[in-house]
């Protein structure tokens, strides 16, 4: 689903319609959970075999290492319920001028050490930029400007 978005074979809206009419299941030996967002700030959360949730322009959306449909009923060492709760508390207390730096502060405060966080990403919709850091190297933030390309089908975005 998200690969089709990245390769511009499907738009966010097309993905949303697909999830609404088709039960999404993991393939044998592979499991995934997706949280997709469009430039307008809408969020589509997909947990194969369990369901999906569409959030229209939420103030924030936190992705988890556990099923949002099971919550704390299922325990495993990497689930990170404490990190999820810390991130939610920081985001609940966020101020109006919350920016990319503040986002990385939340990601840093909730990064995982048991199974170390490999990539942390922030998308700034106003600047149309993606920021990321790898391996919790918070001092090395990468940045990529996205450009609109209306001549291409799909999401209409490409890396420059």
Residue ranges and their predicted role:
Residues 1-7, 29-32, 37-160:
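C-terminal, well-structured catalytic/ligand-binding subdomain of enzymes
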Residues 1-24:
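Compact, glycine/acidic-enriched structural inserts
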